[in-house]
Structures are given as structure tokens and as C-alpha cells.
Amino acid sequence: MARVKRGTIARARHKKVLKQAKGYYGARSRVYRVAVQAVTKAGQYAYRDRRQRKRQFRQLWIARINAAARQNGMSYSRFINGLKKASVEIDRKILADIAVHDKAAFSALVEAAKGALA
């Protein structure tokens, strides 16, 4: 059996990890053993937060819609229920955008929701 020297492979792997850890503080960006842990943990956080980002944006949209709906004298849940009954199919992302940038259009939507509930 021939002897296998792994220097090139190991160096390449070390370089890859240290490149990923570039910008980290202290030993996390310089020492391979510490950098591996830091990069692994960063990957776990990234994986988790890609899923959490979707939840957080939905929470933000709902908070904005709720605030705008209450300014027009209606709660969030009644507003959404009214829109469904009025068969207005606008998602929360667009509703939040309208609430922030176009108050008149949002007021019209609130009136439509009130009309459907009455």
C-alpha cells in the first residue's frame, strides 16, 4: 500500500474554513480549531434564522396593519375578517405596505371591510 500524504488536502480544508471565518473577532478568524467551531455555529444560526425571518416579517406586517386599522377605528382581527368576507385577496405584506405608504387606499380597504361586516 502506498503512503498517502494529506498535506495539500488538509491545507485546502483549513484555508476554506479560515476564509469563511474572515471578519470574525480574535482567534475565531485565525486559529483553525476555533474557527471550525465558529463557522459551524454560524451555519446553525443562519439555518435557524432563515426560517425565523419569515415569522418575524409576518409579525411586523401584522403589527403595522393592526396600528393602521386601529387608527381607522377597527381591530386587526375584525379588519382581516371583513376583508375575507368582502373577498379582497390582498396578502399581509401588501396590506402593510399600503398602510405605511398610502393612507387613503388603506382607509378605503377599512371601509370595504366595515361594509362586509355590516
UniProtKB/Swiss-Prot annotation:
Q: Which UniProt keywords apply?
A: Ribonucleoprotein, Ribosomal protein, RNA-binding, rRNA-binding
Please indicate which superkingdom the organism of origin belongs to: Bacteria
Provide one Gene Ontology biological process annotation: translation
Classification via PROSITE patterns: RIBOSOMAL_L20
Annotated GO MF terms: rRNA binding; structural constituent of ribosome
| Pfam families, A to Z | Ribosomal_L20 (PF00453)
| A GO-annotated cellular component | ribosome
Tell me which family the UniProt entry assigns to this protein: Belongs to the bacterial ribosomal protein bL20 family.
Briefly, what is this protein's role? Binds directly to 23S ribosomal RNA and is necessary for the in vitro assembly process of the 50S ribosomal subunit. It is not involved in the protein synthesizing functions of that subunit.
**Name the UniProt record assigns to this protein:** Large ribosomal subunit protein bL20
Q: Which organism is it from?
A: Alteromonas mediterranea (strain DSM 17117 / CIP 110805 / LMG 28347 / Deep ecotype)
Give the lineage: Bacteria, Pseudomonadati, Pseudomonadota, Gammaproteobacteria, Alteromonadales
